[in-house]
């Protein structure tokens, strides 16, 4: 056991001992060790090189650094504080510079190329052949063959990108937390669901305030904008939400321009036309043009229905208010959409909340994992395993043979110190080892779901249930990885393939058989009445073209900014330019709503992240809709199909080209038709 808990490799992490003042000594020590290991490989005698003492040695050279840094970055996501942020940011340049330097290390690259040309290397097969080829491709794509001056510039670009994208992320979090709305007149909360009202009351009490406190966190925003009758209050909250990342001192506009410029420069140094071509070169889409064409095809297919849906909403509001059909204000969209849904389907999503208590959803998810994938998930108590917050739970996962395949943490509720959204991540990549042993994986799932309130359990919206299933799909991809090479295991796959395991899991949240495993009224234990279930499924594609066009807008904005950077990076009004680029995909409102460009953390909070890759969500929808047809055809609880999905997809990581993995499961290439049918764009 290391004296510094950030350096302790133990499977059960000592979260209570991880203090900000320990970050610097831990990361400095881990960096020194990693640099020493890499330098040793780069200095090996050219006459004594082997695959083991170069490629395999490099694979493990940074293990300690990766684990220590993973603890730091994870804590900053779930338990941010000024001291932790300062400690993280002090170490960020050094960690980023070191990571960027590895593929640009001339001595290292000379030795890897030398080994790759040997008889030993040519004789490699299976995962070791894949690892050698992928490593060589990684180095070439990163610029290993460039002149020294170009390599030095690339290192500097990566370091600056790490710092600027971190600042972008901090601005979004700080702006989100800086705003609150306190309502003291209960009459103004007409229409607000009881759970949201109770949560707002609890939020006010926690701050020592009278009344009801609303924030810019999604569990507060969504019911407020969807149900609150008071338009003035909706406008006030919408205005604040639209300003996230757009006003001083958290204005992200200058950072966006610099991030885009640096990414474009990186692509140019690496002899690529633009950043999209650079990052997509080894993904399924291959080029920015192909990804853009895919999204434009989806746009064309959805355009007619999108226009009709927008007109229908305008006409519905006019009918209800006795006015003329006209553009809605952006703070009216969710409100009148919900009114239209209730009118058309006699269905209010809130009626489902009592059937989705979080604990039952989780239990049902685990039951599903047992039936389909042969897994057993067991919770470990707080007295057995430490976590970073009392709300966090810890679970062990065993497969059908009783093997401990891995464990995970689950952290589902919002806190001011926690970033928004939902995500899966990992701390330890296990799997088989060369000596025949097996190491368990360690992962985590986080979200910002509706929390418990006033003695009631956390009651989720159906969309939140989908999100839980989604993140669990990512988690299974990690926990079930059976690849000996850690960097090729689990979710370390092409970005436009990584969403397949997550998105396919969402399908079970729509099936009556699987819902019956867990969807029970938290007070009566009754299952969802058939009438309500039929209304849920009937309303599934309500305004689905608008949903599709929103995804198209985000993906096109992302791609266009990274393919035509000069048009955006030097633009004083980056918001106006971004809006103009995707105007045809945006719901028409008066006034026009700003885009999410200044709070688009998917593409601007990481040096790469989803940059030029947001299209991956829709790309993977094609894969998941098609793949789920096998379960629909052969049985949604069919354990044989589940075992095949593990064998061909979940266990394989990046052991094989993703298109080939899909073909192994489906017996053919992907078919778009299943997605078009599922989202109501085809019969």
Residue map of PLM features:
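Short conserved micro-motifs at the rims of enzyme active sites and ligand-binding pockets
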Residues: 225-227, 419-421, 455-459, 514-515, ...
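Amphipathic, well-ordered alpha-helical segments in soluble domains
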Residues: 30-37, 61-64, 68, 262, ...
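Short, hydrophobic/aliphatic alpha-helical segments
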Residues: 252-264, 439-445, 483, 652-654
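N-terminal helix-rich structural modules
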Residues: 1-192, 631
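Active-site-proximal, well-structured secondary-structure segments within enzyme catalytic domains
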Residues: 131-132, 160-163, 170, 174-215, ...
């Amino acid at each position: 056991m290391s004296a510094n808990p950030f350096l302790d490799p133990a499977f059960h992490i000592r979260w209570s001992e991880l203090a900000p003042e320990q970050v610097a000594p831990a990361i400095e020590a881990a960096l020194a060790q990693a640099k020493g290991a890499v330098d040793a490989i780069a200095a090996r005698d050219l006459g004594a090189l082997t695959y083991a003492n170069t490629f395999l040695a490099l694979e493990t050279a940074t293990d300690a650094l990766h684990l220590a840094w993973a603890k730091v970055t994870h804590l900053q996501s779930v338990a941010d504080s000024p001291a932790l942020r300062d400690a993280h940011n002090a170490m960020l340049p050094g960690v980023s510079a070191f990571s960027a330097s590895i593929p640009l290390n001339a001595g290292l690259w000379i030795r890897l190329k030398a080994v790759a040309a040997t008889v030993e290397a040519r004789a490699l097969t299976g995962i070791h052949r894949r690892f050698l080829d992928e490593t060589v491709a990684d180095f070439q794509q990163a610029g290993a063959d460039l002149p020294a001056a170009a390599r030095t510039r690339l290192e500097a670009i990566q370091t600056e990108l790490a710092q600027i994208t971190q600042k972008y992320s901090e601005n979004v979090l700080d702006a989100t937390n800086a705003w609150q709305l306190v309502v003291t007149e209960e009459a103004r909360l007409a229409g607000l669901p009881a759970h949201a009202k109770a949560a707002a009351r609890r939020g006010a009490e926690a701050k020592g305030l009278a009344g009801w406190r609303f924030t810019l966190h999604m569990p507060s925003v969504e019911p407020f904008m969807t149900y609150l009758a008071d338009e003035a209050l909706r406008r006030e909250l919408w205005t604040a939400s639209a300003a996230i990342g757009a006003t001083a001192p958290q204005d992200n506009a200058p950072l966006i321009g610099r991030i885009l410029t640096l990414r474009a420069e990186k692509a140019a140094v690496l002899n690529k036309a633009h950043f999209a071509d650079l990052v997509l070169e080894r993904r399924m889409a291959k080029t920015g043009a192909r990804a853009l064409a895919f999204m434009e095809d989806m746009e064309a297919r959805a355009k007619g229905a999108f226009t009709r849906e927008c007109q229908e909403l305008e006409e519905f509001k006019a009918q209800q208010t006795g006015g003329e059909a006209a553009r809605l204000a952006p703070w009216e969209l969710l409100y009148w959409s919900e009114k239209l849904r209730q009118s058309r389907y006699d269905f209010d999503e809130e009626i489902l909340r009592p059937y989705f208590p979080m604990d039952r959803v989780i239990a049902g998810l685990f039951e599903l994992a047992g039936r389909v994938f042969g897994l057993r998930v067991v919770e470990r108590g707080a007295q057995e395993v430490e976590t970073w917050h009392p709300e966090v739970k810890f679970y062990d996962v065993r497969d059908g043979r009783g093997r401990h395949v891995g464990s995970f943490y689950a952290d589902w509720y919002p806190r001011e110190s926690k970033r928004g959204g939902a995500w899966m991540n990992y701390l330890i990549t296990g799997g088989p080892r060369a000596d025949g042993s097996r190491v368990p994986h360690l992962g985590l799932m986080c979200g910002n779901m509706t929390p418990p309130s006033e003695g009631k359990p956390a009651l989720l919206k159906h969309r939140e249930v989908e999100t839980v299933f989604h993140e669990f799909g990512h988690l299974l991809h990690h926990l079930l990885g059976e690849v000996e090479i850690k960097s090729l295991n689990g979710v370390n796959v092409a970005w436009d393939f990584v969403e397949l395991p997550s998105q396919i899991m969402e399908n079970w949240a729509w099936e009556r058989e699987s819902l019956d495993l867990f969807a029970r009224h938290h007070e009566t234990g009754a299952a969802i009445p058939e009438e309500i279930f039929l209304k849920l499924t009937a309303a599934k594609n309500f305004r689905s073209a608008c949903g599709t066009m929103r995804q198209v807008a985000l993906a096109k904005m992302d791609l266009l900014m990274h393919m035509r950077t000069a048009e955006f990076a030097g633009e004083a009004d980056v918001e106006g330019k971004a809006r103009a680029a995707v105007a045809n995909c945006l719901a028409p409102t008066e006034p026009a709503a700003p885009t999410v460009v200044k709070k688009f953390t998917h593409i601007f909070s990481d040096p790469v992240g989803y940059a030029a890759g947001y299209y991956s969500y829709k790309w993977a929808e094609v894969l998941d809709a098609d793949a789920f047809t096998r379960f629909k055809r052969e049985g949604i609880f069919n354990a044989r199909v589940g075992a095949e999905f593990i064998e061909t997809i979940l266990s394989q990581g990046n052991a094989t080209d993703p298109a080939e993995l899909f073909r192994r499961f489906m017996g053919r290439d992907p078919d778009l038709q299943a997605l078009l049918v599922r989202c109501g764009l085809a019969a």
